[in-house]
Amino acid sequence: MNSLLYSLIQNSNKARRSSYPSRRHFLLGAAGAMIASAGTSAFASVIAPSRDQDNSPRRGLPLKIETIELIELYGRYTEEAGINGQQQVNPLDVYDDLRPQPYQDKPSGSKEVHTSAVYLRIRTSGGIEGLYGPIEKSAAVVVQQDLRPFLLGKDALAGEALWDEMYRSNRHSRDGLFMMAISAVDNTLWDIRGRYYQVPVYRLLGGPTRSSVEMYASCLGFSLEPEAVRTRALALKREGFRYQKWFMGYGPGSGPEGMQKNVELVRILRETLGEDTEIMFDAYSGWDQDYALEWAHQVEKYRPHWIEEATHPEKIESFAAMRRSTTIPIASGEHFYGRWEVERYLQAGALSVVQADPEWCGGTSELLRIGTVASLHDIPVIPHGHSLHAAVHIISSQSPMTFPLGEYLVNKMQHYYHFESNPLIVDKAHIALPTGPGFNIQLDPGKIESQTIFAKE
């Protein structure tokens, strides 16, 4: 058990009990002009900072944003069979015809899968470029239509000003796809700054505070059949993961039988892994308060490390009520958009762990602010693991008391960075700190079968 993290979460629970005694083909063509398509020539050279003859960065030049490009890459990868078919409870569970179907094992053997990914590239007048991704295709449309015209000509180094201006530029900017688009731009601008100063982003943020970032194994997509769970859980433990998160397969629509399967999953994991591995669970907003509390009361004896998104994130009072009513820590935040939402939850005593995502919540800049807000309440921030680049740099730059751990989606990350030549690698449940400038994302031309680049100066 990680005694520091355990202490953080347990102390936050003690504090709230005294303080509150009663209480997811890319249509960018219509949004911009296509300037390049098909082939891999655009990435024949690695993005690198421009340098003077004395090999020092051109720090005296302004970094005006000249071009914003959205690049969709296409290729293929080989997928391990039998790991992408597990049902996961979700808010649609209440509808019989929309409820996730039970898992069925796929045929043995691997298969070839077509894939695509979108990256954002910003070019500046100083010759320095920033690259970030993969980003959500739907958010890329917002970058293309709404943010690009606003950003062209602005100073890429003026991070605080640009974030605030993007946020104020549209009445819909406070959440959803617009905030996800702000996140993509913000992260790309941090990459530019790191390349400009020739240091990793975590150094710009004040780090490092450690030499590597510990990750927990997030088991989305794996079979929930008992023997498969035992096999997978033990394999992850042997790989060094001291924390494992599993995803609930059933909700209220599956009745008592589904509830017992959810409870059985907890029992199997605790008995399989013993007391030296923490187990966490995610309900992906597919339960309601009563269902969550019934489950909690049945599994408290197995000491889950947290239950995540037990109900819809809009229901702050339900989260607060659950936190008052069970010893199991309450986690949420992947669908938080900005520090204001986090503060409302924390003021209500509704969370033991904040899980904001730097790809969605407002980028690197906003997750740092969220960390400050959470630290005022002695609540740890463990970023949602939709992506790794920004999260690893942020975690490693901040106090372990505030950012103790990261999420590693074991299944997803096997292919999510398919087009990158230097993806972040987990070794013994840790990711070593990158040493290149910025986020140091490099694309592999050999893996890009075709591409489409949309840009408008």
Regions found by a protein language model. Name each.
Residues 33, 60-80, 89-98, 365, ...:
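Flexible C-terminal active-site loop/helix
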Residues 85-116:
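Aromatic- and Gly/Pro-rich amphipathic surface segment
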Residues 127, 185, 198, 307, ...:
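Conserved, mostly hydrophobic/aromatic
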Residues 84, 106-108, 123-196:
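Metal- or metallocofactor-binding catalytic centers and their adjacent structured scaffolds
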Residues 101, 297, 303, 314-430:
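Shared catalytic-loop signature of beta/alpha-barrel
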Residues 1-22:
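N-terminal secretory signal peptides
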Residues 212-321, 325-326:
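Metal-dependent enolase-superfamily TIM-barrel catalytic cores that perform enediolate-based chemistry
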Residues 21-43:
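N-terminal export leaders
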